[in-house]
């Protein structure tokens, strides 16, 4: 082995060889310390390899971040330890070590970006240093201000980071701060002259910090954020009044008058840059985007631009600095040998780690230097006059690789591989794959390279070399290494990581970039184990349609598995969508065909180490059929998005939980509404305006929820998805229209108390069914191509299509809320008068109880038919709690209607009682015991009531469960 393995590696090649064939040799003699702490085992040495229950693990002497440690292990064809160390290894560790995850290859390091920006340098406190925005500000009912600041810790007096003075209000808005020596910087927000307390914002360490302040007129809610975390917040600051219009924004100074009145005492001492101002209060997620160099554009009043400022001459010339865009403070799993427990640390903190292997692949990697293909490695290294391809795949890489060197080495490697006539040997393939992984890993290293690195040239070189090692003549070599590398897709995944790095080279003048080597020569492709529900992938192939096939035996299945590890089923191997904040998940539904099982040849699950494995992150089983399984990834339609007016990105666990709750609640509501509608039809409830309204409401709402439950399966077909969206749009609008009719009818019966006949059911039917037809037709005519949202079957929130539903719903909910409030007032007044008539001097407790019940009762009775449970759906973009509330409230609406307007409704119960009496009478008549025949059989009429349910004895109240 090479020297870089270190002293701890040398004992690996001792005399002993274990039964698995891995040379372990005699371990180092434990060094015993006879101190006060008792005997202690010697710590594991750098480069030492120790046998574990699941294979072998090699201890690296380096301390790296979680992502760098994972990358280092992958370059050596291993992986981070997937479980806590056991046995002797656990007792020999001294520091916490990183622990991997079974889906770790799918995790990527955050792409730190660097950018150059102008900085205002306030190197000393003077009264003549300030930067003023030329244009006045509008009236602000809410605002957010963010900036990067480097505070001068030697100045203890309070200073203004920025201030806004209005014509009649000098202290309209300020953010003030001061530093405690050796402690923290405390900041306070001032709004309309009201001063919040000084609270700790960030450490007084002289470094750059990102500071944000938010404020809302309603309730005077304010919050202070620094470095992505909420530090303070409260209510009551300048509540009820906006920041007046005509305000002047000044950076670095307090204003005692409009645009002036500067003082040395309140002048900023430090550096300030990247100031942004919004006319709304940003959410924590949006503040994270602003901190990550991607400020939201909605409501943005001022984007950092020194050219838009009047800068005093003493601040000129401006200084340019390079800032690193922050990354999330994500935590990664660790194992602590002290308490022998699992924990977590910040992923960017350097920690030691273990690279682990299964026993057989590790034994093969040990023998790699004796494999064929060493001549290619020697030739490339000789031409480069450097170690480009490492003969030993288990050796650690020492020394940094610059982008220029990588580009030059890629050119040499491409030339040698193109001139090679014989198929590439296993040793050379391992070395080439490792070098490509090393080149791709450059993007996760120094953030400065993200702007300066020649990523387009490097990407072209990587794609060219990768194409050469994916040639058909190398298929046998890939098969021989399938347990070591995991198949060609491991190389494809590495190449794909270059795509986000290329975004630094794309501009508005060059919005597209294509890097290609040559066509892979796909023809006659056969897709194994799958079929396509959409023909979008088939269009990428210039050949006949794809025919799904399935293996007939276990032997054929194993052959197919080997085939899958070297063949592709589409010209599109993989695809991703990125924006400025990272990868964007795209919804996808696919079907897996079942394989017929034979009792003589039981199927063996494919090994992930032999290629052809499925990635399951964010995916779940959508449906099970007799011959197939439908799988879904990342997005679906639920109650939470019907009234959602902004796009909300949710995690796969949260999305799956919402989808499950929606489906279960929707099913319960659908069954309850269907039962209610059938009871209205079958029971023979007396006809009335209220009964007609409730029939139409339950029918339309049940139909809409039925289509909502089927929307999951409709996504696979574009036409079906559009049809389901149109049906849901129409039926939900019909349901809300009948909710409005219910409110108008309630107003006429309870509030107006008109003795004149109403407008008639024709007008009600025109409102309930005609208006929704018009709205849906107009929406389809105006937005034929932007009607359906991408990813699920519902209206598009990125266009005005969503307002064709949200607008009418808001109108109905507003009108019904006003009607309900008026009904409650009348009910409370009537209850108060009734209580006084029954008891001239009622006690205080009885009065309070009477008024509370008079308020709660109509709300409980009328809430479901007026649709007020849908109000939570408008707020789902604010917090996940509102999404769950919307799903819960809307799911129980149908059950609530059934309980109040069917199960507990006296008219329905009376109708059912009449039906029962009629059925019993028919049975008795059929038995010949009715009328005169009753005497012959000695069955008196007094027996008949025993077969019937008791009649209600309490009088009907007008607000008690009307039909």
UniProtKB/Swiss-Prot annotation:
Keyword Disulfide bond: yes
Domain Pentraxin (PTX): 116-325
Chief location bin: membrane
Positions of the GAIN-B domain: 489-649
Region span, GPS: 599-649
Keywords: Disulfide bond, G-protein coupled receptor, Glycoprotein, Membrane, Receptor, Transducer, Transmembrane, Transmembrane helix
Extracellular compartment segments: 1-662, 713-720, 784-800, 879-880
Membrane topology type: Multi-pass membrane protein
Biological process per Gene Ontology, one example term: G protein-coupled receptor signaling pathway
Record protein name field: Adhesion G protein-coupled receptor D2
Organism of this sequence: Homo sapiens
């Amino acid at each position: 082995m090479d020297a870089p393995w270190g002293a701890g590696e040398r004992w690996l090649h001792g005399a002993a060889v274990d039964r698995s064939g891995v040379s372990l040799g005699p371990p180092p003699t434990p060094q015993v310390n006879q101190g006060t702490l008792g005997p202690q085992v010697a710590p594991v040495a750098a480069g030492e390899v120790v046998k574990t229950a699941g294979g072998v693990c090699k201890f690296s002497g380096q301390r790296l971040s979680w992502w760098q440690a994972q990358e280092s292990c992958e370059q050596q064809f291993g992986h981070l330890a997937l479980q806590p160390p056991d046995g002797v290894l656990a007792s020999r560790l001294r520091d916490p070590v990183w622990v991997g995850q079974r889906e770790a290859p799918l995790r990527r390091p955050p792409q730190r970006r660097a950018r150059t920006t102008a900085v205002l340098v306030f190197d000393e406190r003077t009264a003549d240093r300030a930067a003023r925005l030329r244009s006045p500000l509008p009236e602000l009912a809410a605002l957010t201000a963010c900036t990067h600041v480097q505070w001068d810790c030697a100045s203890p007096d309070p200073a203004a980071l920025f201030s806004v003075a209005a014509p009649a209000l000098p202290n309209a808005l300020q953010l003030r701060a001061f530093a405690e020596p050796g402690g923290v910087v405390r900041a306070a927000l001032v709004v309309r002259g009201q001063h919040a307390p000084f609270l700790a914002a960030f450490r007084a360490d002289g470094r750059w910090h990102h500071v944000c302040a938010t404020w809302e007129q309603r309730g005077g809610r304010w919050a202070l954020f620094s470095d992505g975390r909420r530090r303070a917040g409260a209510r009551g600051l300048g509540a009820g009044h906006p920041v007046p219009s005509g305000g002047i924004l000044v950076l670095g100074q307090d204003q005692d008058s409009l645009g002036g009145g500067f003082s040395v005492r309140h002048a900023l001492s430090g550096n300030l840059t990247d100031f942004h101002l919004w006319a709304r209060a940003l959410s924590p997620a949006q503040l994270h985007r602003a901190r990550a160099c991607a400020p939201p554009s909605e409501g943005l009043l001022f984007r950092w631009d020194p050219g838009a400022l009047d800068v005093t001459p003493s601040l000129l010339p401006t200084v340019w600095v390079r800032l690193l865009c922050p990354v999330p403070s994500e935590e990664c799993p660790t194992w602590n040998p002290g308490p022998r427990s699992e924990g977590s640390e910040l992923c960017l903190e350097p920690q030691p780690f273990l690279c682990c292997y299964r026993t057989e692949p590790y034994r093969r990697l040990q023998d790699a230097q004796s494999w064929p293909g060493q001549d290619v490695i020697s030739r490339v290294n000789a031409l480069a006059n450097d170690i480009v391809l490492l003969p030993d795949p288990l050796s650690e890489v020492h020394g940094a690789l610059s982008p220029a060197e990588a580009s030059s080495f890629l050119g040499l490697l491409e030339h040698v591989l193109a001139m090679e006539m014989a198929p590439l040997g296993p040793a050379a393939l391992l070395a080439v794959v490792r070098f490509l992984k090393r080149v791709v890993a450059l993007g996760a290293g120094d953030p400065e390279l993200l702007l300066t690195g020649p990523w387009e040239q490097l990407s072209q070189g990587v794609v060219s070399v990768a194409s050469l090692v994916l040639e058909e003549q190398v298929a046998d070599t890939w098969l021989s290494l399938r347990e070591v590398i995991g198949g060609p897709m491991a190389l494809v995944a590495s190449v794909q990581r270059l795509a986000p790095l290329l975004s630094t080279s794309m501009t508005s003048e060059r919005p597209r970039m294509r890097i290609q080597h040559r066509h892979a020569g796909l023809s006659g492709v056969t897709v194994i184990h799958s079929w396509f529900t959409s023909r979008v992938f088939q269009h990428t192939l210039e050949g006949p349609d794809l025919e799904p096939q399935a293996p007939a035996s276990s032997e054929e299945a194993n052959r197919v598995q080997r085939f899958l590890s070297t063949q592709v089923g589409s010209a599109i191997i993989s695809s991703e969508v990125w924006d400025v904040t990272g990868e964007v998940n795209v919804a996808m539904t696919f079907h897996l065909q079942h394989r017929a099982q034979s009792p003589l040849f039981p199927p063996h699950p494919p090994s992930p180490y032999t290629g052809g494995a499925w990635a399951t992150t964010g995916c779940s089983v959508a449906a099970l059929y007799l011959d197939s399984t439908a799988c879904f990834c990342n997005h679906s339609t639920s109650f939470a998005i019907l009234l959602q007016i902004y796009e909300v990105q949710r995690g796969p666990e949260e999305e799956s939980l919402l989808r499950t709750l929606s489906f279960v609640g929707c099913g319960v509501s659908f069954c309850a509404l269907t039962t209610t509608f059938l009871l209205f039809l079958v029971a023979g409830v007396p006809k009335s305006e209220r009964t007609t309204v409730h029939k139409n409401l339950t029918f339309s709402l049940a139909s809409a929820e039925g289509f909502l439950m089927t929307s999951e399966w409709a996504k696979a077909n574009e036409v079906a998805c559009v049809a389901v969206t149109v049906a849901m749009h129409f039926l939900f609008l019909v349901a809300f229209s009948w909710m409005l009719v219910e409110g108008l009818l309630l107003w006429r019966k309870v509030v107006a108390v008109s003795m004149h006949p109403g407008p008639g059911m024709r007008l009600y039917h025109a409102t309930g069914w005609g208006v929704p037809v018009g709205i849906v037709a107009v929406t389809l005519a105006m937005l034929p191509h932007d009607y359906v949202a991408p990813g699920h079957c519902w209206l598009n929130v990125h266009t005005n299509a969503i307002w064709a539903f949200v607008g009418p719903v808001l109108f109905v909910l507003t009108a019904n809320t006003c009607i309900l409030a008026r009904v409650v007032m009348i009910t409370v007044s009537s209850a108060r008068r009734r209580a006084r008539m029954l008891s001239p001097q009622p006690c205080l407790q009885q009065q309070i109880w009477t008024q509370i019940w008079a308020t709660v009762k109509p709300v409980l009775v009328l809430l479901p038919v007026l649709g007020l449970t849908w109000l939570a759906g408008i707020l789902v973009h604010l917090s996940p709690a509102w999404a769950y509330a919307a799903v819960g409230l809307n799911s129980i609406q149908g059950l609530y209607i059934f309980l109040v307007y069917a199960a507990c409704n006296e008219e329905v119960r009376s109708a059912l009682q009449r039906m029962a009496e009629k059925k019993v009478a028919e049975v008795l008549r059929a038995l010949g015991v009715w009328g005169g025949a009753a005497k012959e059989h000695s069955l008196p009429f007094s027996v008949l009531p025993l077969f019937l349910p008791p009649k209600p004895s309490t009088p009907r109240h007008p607000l008690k469960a009307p039909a």
